[in-house]
Amino acid sequence: MFRFIKKSTNTPMLGVDFGSSTIKAVAVSGSAESFSIDSWAEIATPKGAIRDFQLQDVDRVSQAFKQLLRMLPGKYKNAATAVNGSSVITKITQVASNINQIDFENIVMMEAEQLIPFPLDEVSLDFEVLGPNITDPARNDVLICAARSQSIASAISVFNDSDLTV
């Protein structure tokens, strides 16, 4: 599923929170086992640019984000953020553990069609196997996460405008 810092990387990364009142960034480096916070910055979100967890005015958010980047020491190439609010759905389902990866992924997609209240062509979908189900060890608990693609595209647009890789 989503990985904040890959185990083998020492590449500095920005973690960014696009909030309705402020945009915050924290610069981290290291690995998943041993990381450090190098710096952080915060700037006011342009009024009305983010409402109900959604970027309403990508251009104004992008300009504010560029100002925030100038407040941080150093240059960064990678960024990560989270999406939240009503555009994100998470569900846990169970899938048989004795099937191959391709069948497993197909079953997860069929489960997602039943569980996610949005058309699947409008969402970005990911899943993570949580492990054996407590009551039925022959099945795995699987966390399915779906976010409206438009929500993700807006954040990616802000990062791309600042030459950052998501």
Predicted features and spans:
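Gly/Thr-rich phosphate-binding beta-strand-loop-beta motif of the actin/hexokinase/Hsp70
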Residues: 2-44, 73, 77-84
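Charged, flexible boundary elements
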Residues: 1-4, 164-166
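Conserved NTP-handling cores and scaffolds of large molecular machines
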Residues: 29-32, 69-72, 116-120
